[in-house]
Each structure stands twice: as C-alpha cells, then as structure tokens.
Amino acid sequence: MGNEKLRKDLHRTIRTRDLNAVKHIILKKYTFSNKNALSTPLYLAVSNSDIDIVKFLLDNGADINKCKSPPLHKAINLGNVEMVKLLVDHGADIEKVYLGNSPLYLALCKRNTNITKYLLERGADPNTLFINYCDAIYNKIPIDIFKILIKYKVSLNIQNSHFKTPIYYAIKCTNYPLIKLLLENNASLTIPEGYNNHYLITAVKHNCDISILRLLIKYGVPVNEQDDLERTSLHYCVSAGKHDILKLLLDYDADPNITDSCLGTPLHYAVSRNDIIATTLLIEKGANVNIHNDTIDTVLNIAVGNRNKILINLLLMYGANTRLKSRNPLIHKALETKDINILSEILNHGAEVNIYNREGYTPLYIAIITFMQIKFAKLLLRYGSNPNMKNESNENTPLHGAILSNRLDSVELLMSYNVDVHSINKLGHTPLSCINYISDKIATIIISKIVLDLEKDSNLFLLDGFKANIECIDQNDRFKVIRKNCEDELKSIRNIKLNHRYSLSIFLHSDNNNNILIRFLNHPKVEKLSSCISIYKKYIQKTKLSSSIRYKLIHDAIEYSNNISMINSVPINVKYMIMEMLDNKDLKSIIDSVNK
C-alpha cells in the first residue's frame, strides 16, 4: 500500500477518533523516513480535540514545531486546557507568534483564565503583550485577567515602540476600572522628557468620562500639561464642546490663558465656535479677553466676524478693548458684517473710527464705496469719523469715493459735515475732477461749495486743489453753466436785506456768530425763503436749525437759572448777555445741573 493511501487513511481515522486504527497504521504499516510527515496529522488531531491521539502521535515522533500552523495556537483557540498542557510539556514554543498572535495573547483574547495562568506559570512573558499589541488588548481583556497579569509581575510602566505605556492605552480605551487598577498598583503618571503621552489630553481627546479625568487629576496628572502643539486639555475640551469637563478642569485651576503654537487660548477656540457657555465659563475663571498678538485675531474680532451679538456683548461687558491691535482693525471687521447694531455697539465702546485697514482705506471710505446703506456712514460720522481723511494708497477722500461711486446720498451727507472739496489725491485730482462724468445734482452740490468758499476766503487761489477745481470747471461747459447759476443765486441772496447792515447771506455760513443769527430767526425773509433760492437753500436751512437750537438753549438756560441762587436776581438782559457768552455745551451743563 502506498504512503499516499496510508496518509489518507491516517487522516480519516484521526477524524473518526479511532485510536486503535491510528496505532495500527503508524506501528504496523506506515514507515516514515521523515518524521515531519506526522506534523499534519498532529495538527488534525489537536483540531479534533482528541488528546489520546495527540499524545500517541507525540510519543511516536511528531514534531510540534514543524507544523505549518502551530498546534498550541489551535488548542488555545479551542479552549482545551489539557491539550495546551500536553503540547507545552512536549516542547511547544509558548512565545511563538503566528499570524501576529502569541499564545498568551490568544488566551487573553479568549478570556481563558486557566490557560492564561498556565502559560504564565510556564514562563510566558506578559510584557510582550504591551510591547507588541498596543491598544489591541485593552478592550478585549476583562479586569480579572489584568489582575492575573499584575500578579505575575507584569511591568506596568513598560513602553512599546511608540513609547506608550499601559496606562496610556487604558485611558485611550476609556477603561475606568483598568485605569483605576493600574494606578492602585503604582503605574507611573510621570512623563519622561521628550515623550508625548499627555494623559489628561488623551482622556479629553478620546471622550473619557468625567470620572476618569477626576481620577487622573487625583493621582497627580498636571492639569496644564501641553502637547506637541502646545495645547492643553482646556483647548481640546473647548474644541469638542465638553462643558462638564471644561468646568471640572477650571475648578482644578487649569490656566485659561495658556497659548498654543498658533498663539490661541482656549477662549479663542470658544469664541470661534460661537460657544457662549464655554466663553462664559472661561471668562468667569479669569480668561483674558484682551490677549492679542500678530498671529491670531483678538477674541472680540472673532466674535464680530462671526456676527455673534451675544458674545460681542459678553466680551464687552467683561472689558474687551475695542482698540487692541489686530490683523484687521475691529471697526473694519464690524463694517464687514454689514450689521448696524454691531457697528453701533463697538463704536459705543470706543472703537477707533479713524484707522486704516490692511489696504489703507478708512472705515468711512469703505462704507461709501461698498454701497452700504447711508446709515453706516452717518453712524461713523456721528462718532467722529474724519470726512477729510485720505486713503494711504491713492489719497482719495470719502468725497472722492462718493463721487466715483455716483452716490448722491453720500455726497449730501459729507457736504453737511463741511467736507473739503479742494482735497487732491495722488494723481492731482479733486473730487470734482476725479471722474469724467458727474451728474448735474452732484456737480451742483460741489460747485456751489467752491463758489461759496471763494466768496468767504479769497486766499483759496493759493491752493492747488482750488486751482484744479477752477481748471476743471473752465474746461467743462456744463460746469460753467452751473457756476454761473451759483454766482447769480448768491448775488440774489446778498440783495435780500434783513436790515441796514445784514443781508440773508449771513445764513450761508454756519460758523457765523449765532447770537446775531438768532435775532433774525423770526424775520419774514428768513422764515419764508424766496423762491429764487434753490441751490443754497440747504445751507440756509442748516444754519437756521443750528441757530434755533442755540436760541432754545439760551432761553432754557435763562429760565433754569432762576433756580440758581447766585444769578436768580440778575436782571434778564444781563442774563442774556451772560448766556450769549457761553457755548452750547456750557448752556446744556446749566440746564442739566438744575434738572438733577
């Protein structure tokens, strides 16, 4: 009978568990020139869990270590303790790694306490588990088996090739019982210099329960540890929106002002995420709302950029400085939101209104040329925006921008602030000459101011800007007609006499003595302007309004002064003389002092 036929018969008898037939084939018929031929039958017998056949094969020369697949691994997978003992007694290698698995690792994965204990008793090295299997074992092994490993003197501080220790992987796997067990058995939380285990940060990044963090802090993990990016646990729990952990860390005195490699604090991350709760917690625990540098925006800038009004108000309430240096000035950031309420809030808290952005533009210029609603420009001007401030790049003024954008509303607004119509840009152009075509309405507004300025100040001829304006008008027939109309109307206004000394022209200049203008407020020719006045009507009306306001202030101040003991007995005409010497601000102070 050929060996192939005998081999098949041997495999068949092993599968049928026929020990006598196995003995008969091997002892009587099957002569082996190569004992390795019994390796396959041995593995088959182990797989069949037939310990008697396995013992017989081993006694007759089967070599455990010649099998293609280790019989010991198979026995462990089957959970056959006696088979494991038999194989080990016959020389099975208890450290042999097959398909990435050692016998001890397989026993642990199968959670077979008996086999685990036996392998350890026979000298299996438990430390190879932590060196070779990293975090693979931590979710597979119950706490009781870890206790066995500790009993057999496993090193709790051993490092694998990544320089990670068992406690690191226990934290990574969020295994509270194991973390507690390791710490109770003196696992070290000290991180050697140059290593990056960062236990608390690892706990936060892997969504550990708050109880784990509390345990780690109890055993001495520093709450302000920083990783390779110089971030702390606070940075990571803020980024993940974990408010309970954030509160815990802050209660344990975590520093909210540590900056990472990007120079960002936890507060930067909280505001960037629009996280009101985290922002509040950090500020209440001392986070600096005014940290700033050249790398990252201020927290207030970030809140404004996010259009988060709640955060803006919160930061301002806690003292955020609206004038901190940043990559993009706060006022420009607020303008970008196109939200009038945000702009108003930061202006109300002292934001610098006359500051250039990175392109060298002023806030007022931006508001005009980007076609924002006129209320934005009005607000900026009310808070002190300089209507004559030039851009750094081309030296255009807001009036240049308004005319280039053909914005009648902006031109009218700027003119009401007595803007300089003679300002020239880098190319030598005034607002009037900076564009080829201007509408009649805008041209009339500008030219009427030029004509009026000339009447007031003959030295204008010395200004380059005035010369440029006159040259522009002289080269444009339409402009010349407008100038002629302005000159004719001014002549008509001068001919409207209010008395032997003054004409209606005194109302053309708001800087004239208001005390004189007040006397003519009720004059019929002032109350009802002539129909011939159209171009300069707004100038006169503006002056009338300011004079009316001053008249009321003087009248009210005299009336309220009757309650002031020092001057209540002063004759009324003297009181008028006194009040006329005061400016409007002083008059308001008198009224307010009595009202209090």
Curated annotation (Swiss-Prot):
Keywords: ANK repeat, Repeat. It comes from the Viruses. ANK repeats lie at residues 5-34, 37-66, 68-96, 99-128, 130-158, 162-191, 195-225, 229-258, 262-291, 295-324, 326-355, 359-389, 394-423. The keyword Transport does not apply. The keyword DNA-binding does not apply. InterPro entries: Ankyrin_rpt, Ankyrin_rpt-contain_sf, PRANC_domain. Pfam families: Ank_2, Ank_3, PRANC. This is Putative ankyrin repeat protein FPV024. The lineage of its organism: Viruses, Varidnaviria, Bamfordvirae, Nucleocytoviricota, Pokkesviricetes.
